[in-house]
Amino acid sequence: MSHAPGFLALIEAKRAQVREVSVAQARDRAAAGARLIDIREQSEWAAGHASGAEYVGKGVIERDIEGRVPNKDAEIILYCGGGFRSVLAADALQQMGYTNVVSMAGGWREWNALGAPTEA
C-alpha cells in the first residue's frame, strides 16, 4: 500500500517522540506482563491477531483506554497493520499521560512474517 507524503511526514515527526520495539521485544515484554493492544480495524482483528493481544480500535483508543488500562505507568505495546497507526496512537496516549507506551515496529505484517503466534 502506498501512503500519501503528508501522512508519511506526520509519522516520521511522531516517530521521533515515540519509542518503538521489535516483534521479538514485544513478544518478550508481553510474556512478562505488558499489555499487547491491537489497534487495527475490527475486520482486521477478526481476520487474525497476535496471540494474547486485546483489541481497542484506533478510532476509540483515546476514549476507551483509561477504562481498559487505568494505570498510566503500565507497560503498553500498541500494534497496527504496518507500524504507522500505532505510532500515532502511542503519541496520543503519551499526551494523555501514559508513561510506558511503545509502538511495535512493522506491526501485524512483521509479526505474521516472522511466524509469531496468532489466533483468530
Regions found by a protein language model. Give the residues of each.
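Rhodanese-like catalytic fold shared by cysteine-dependent sulfurtransferases
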Residues: 1-35, 42-77, 81-120
